[in-house]
Every structure is written in structure tokens, then in C-alpha cells.
Amino acid sequence: MDYTMDIKSFSGGINEYTTEGLLKLNEAVKSKNCNTDSGSLKTIVTPSLIKDFGERIVSLMPYYNNTIEDYLVGIGTQIRNSNNSSLLSYALSGSKLDSLNFEYKGKKIFVFCSELDNVGMIGELGNRKLKNRRISYNKEGEIDGYIDANGVKKATEAEITTYAPKGRFIELHYDRLWVAGDNENPDRVYFSTAGVNGADIEDWTSPIEEAEANQHGGFIDVRSYDGGKIIGLKVIFNAVVIFKNKTAYKVFGNSPDNYELVQLFSSSGAIADKSICVGNNGAYFLNNDGIYFYDGTNTNLISQKIKNTISRMNSNYASNSVAYFYNNKYYLAIPIDNSTTNNVLIEYNTLSNSFVLHEIGDISDFIEINNDLYFSSGNTVKSLTKGNSYLPLYWETANYDFGMKNARKNSSYIYFRGKGNGSVRFRVITEKKEKFIDIPLTSTETLYRKKLKNKGRMFKMIIENVNNSNIEITNPQLLVEVDLD
């Protein structure tokens, strides 16, 4: 009696959680460098070089220069543009940066923070540190001076020598800048004013009287009493969410006079700060257990299907993990085994709830630019989605017994639709032996029927691209005769 090992779709991705005997045929026990978005099995490109900066890149940031979409890099103590020119007249203490682009006073600006340095800006309003002062008005409502953070009044803004706070994380919410991650105050979140005279990102001063709360900036101390510090700051569901090592909090309210701090959830392990991404009406993040999704009410583990990969994560360097949400996918680069840098890229398709893994190493940051996903790797910036060569593809099914464990089986033909510029290799493995066939593909989709004989009681199929060729395979079917005697 004839049966088929029929892979109707590859959309299930990799599944390291379910017992192999219970895996669906659209899932793989092992895979690498596959695109399964449309249900077919496709190769992915080798990331292409955008620019080599000659020194290791720590941060990669989008930058909107008028109408031009560009990027900046953090290298050493500098912020450089895509031409490798430094943009600041002063040296930073480090180049691990967080940043924002927005319009302020009718001008486009880039605002950044770097943990040990005061918040700074680059753009049409100058390249400098942000100051911390409040504007003083006379009875007629005219500006009559500036009062610094120490309460000392100055005649001109140029005389102000007090500056915006320090921090590693920055967000914009209701016209206020929010900053956290100050080494000297690791539980503190600062915010600028958005008072009666509009947003002022250079007024972080605390109100002198309670009635003035909405006219100034200020800060909130987020005490968790578990030894944790703030390691992330995101705007989710139109609210500021503060991530600490093992907990997360939400700031309810739209102005200082009604701010309320509420704990959202606690975590069983340290959260990797650069793994936190907002997408699909929630937040994704990594901790020691795996990848979690917070939907505004509940926090759920979603990475069971790649539990073996997560278990290999080098916990000593997990804080180096970086992520980005792009085209309904959560991309997460992590270090596994003995690697100190990120050497595996996890791609989670939120629409199909499936995972694929890519062998792309040393990813230190991501940005979306020009409808593409760029990443930094060592000294270079690369494109993840554009390239002229292809990575080695590998897809391995579970062992399949056709529901008859003890029956003898013989395979005869492999059927599939395919196209490409090289050859595809099908390997059929049983408990007795392995057989394979390399099949040259045409550039237009063609129906193929090729002999592929093997025998045994359990069948496994492995699909690969020969010599890193570009291939696309749809609905492979292995015809098998089962001896029921």
C-alpha cells in the first residue's frame, strides 16, 4: 500500500519542545537559515555590507536629517554619521546609546543619552548637551531670565551651567522626555516639563510648590527592594513602562499631579534591556527562561518551541542580547554556548507563531532604515534583507513511521515544486541507511519527480541547498510503499 510523507507547508518552523514523535510535518526538529513565511521553504541572503567604519560599533541609531533617512553609530567616545565623521565637539564617556528623533520648536532633532553623560542633542538646534533650567517670566508674561537647577537666576540662557540628567534609556511621552538608568540613582526616572507654555526638553527642574507640579519636570523613584535597578524604559499602550531586573512598573496618568506607579509583573530572571521591543500591541523581552510577551494585562512565555536553543544561552553574556520588531517579526540575537558575542539570530513570526534560527553572528544593534533592517556587526553596518549570495539552508523533519512502527517501508519517488539557480539536496534517512539526491532547479517553478529509494521502518527527510544556491521548495512528497505483512 502506498503512502506519502507529505509536507504541505513549512510554516510551523522549528519545534524543540514537542516530543519528536508528535511533531507535525510542517515543523522541523532542526533548521537554519530558512524563510518559511509563505509556506514554502526558501533560502535567505547573506547580509550585505553597507559600510566598514574601521572600529567596533557599539550602537546603531536612526537619524532623520531633514527629509533624508540616515543612521548614526556610536564608536568609542564619539557619535559618527554614515560618512564616519564625528558630530560632537566633546567626548562621551561611552558609546552604548539610546536615542529618539522628533520635531521640537519646528526643527528636527536627535536626542540621545549614554549612561554617564548628560542627555544631548544633534540637529538644527545645535549639537550639544541639553541644559536644565526653567524660564522666568515677568508680570507681563515676558521672559526676564533663566533659573538654573540650583535656583540661581541668570540673565541669559548662555550663562546656565546646569544640565539635563544622565541615563541609559530615553523615551518621549505627552511632550515630555523621560530618562532612566542613571548610575548614581539607579531607581530613578526623570522627566522634563510639558507645562502651560508647551514642551521644554531643557526644563527638568522640580516644582517649588505643589501647585506648580504641571509647570516643571521632576523625577520618580521606583523602589522594588529586590536589589534590582532600572534596565529599560518603553512607551507601551500610551503609558511609560519601567523595566527593572526582575519587575516592571507602569506610570499611570498624563501629568505629574496625577502620576501613579503600579507594578505590572515580576520575572524569574534578569531581563536583557536591549531585548525589549514594542510591537503588536505589547512588548517582547528576554529573560533567563526565554522570550516573554506582555499584552497589557498578562505576561506569557512564548519561546517554548526553541527551548533547547534558549537553554544553550550563555547567561554570563545574555545582557549583550539585542532585538528589533520589524514586519511583524521579533528578531533577537543572543550568545549561545561559549560565545561572548551574539552568534544566533532568532526570528519569531508573530503572525504564524513560528520560529526560525539563522547563523548570523556578532550582531550588536539593529535599526530599520529605508524599508530595510540594518544591523551592526564588529566594525561594520550590514543589511539583513539585501544581498547577492545565500546562506546554507538546512531543514530536518522528525522521524516518521506513517502510523505503523513495525511495518517495513520502501521509498520510491520524491515529488515537489521548486525553482532556483542551483541544486537542492534531499536526504532520506532510515534506521538502516541514508540516501540522497541532488536535483538541479530551473529559474521558473517546475514540478519535479525523481527516484529516491530507501528502506526502513522510520523515515526522516533533510533538505539543503547545494553550494549555498538560491532555492525555493514547495510541498515535497516522498512516496513510500508500506509492507503490511
Predicted regions and their residues:
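Disordered, low-complexity "stalk" and linker segments at domain junctions of extracellular
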Residues: 2-4, 10-11, 51, 85-174, ...
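Structural signature of WD-repeat beta-propellers
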Residues: 74-76, 114-115, 181, 243-245, ...
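Beta-propeller and closely related beta-pinwheel folds
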Residues: 46-56, 89-97, 138-320, 354-356
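Short loop/turn segments that connect beta-strands within beta-propeller blades
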Residues: 83-85, 124-126, 253-256, 297, ...
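Beta-sheet repeat architectures centered on beta-propellers
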Residues: 1-81, 91-109, 228, 267-282, ...
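Sequence-pattern detector for short linear motifs
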Residues: 131-132, 136-137, 179, 422, ...
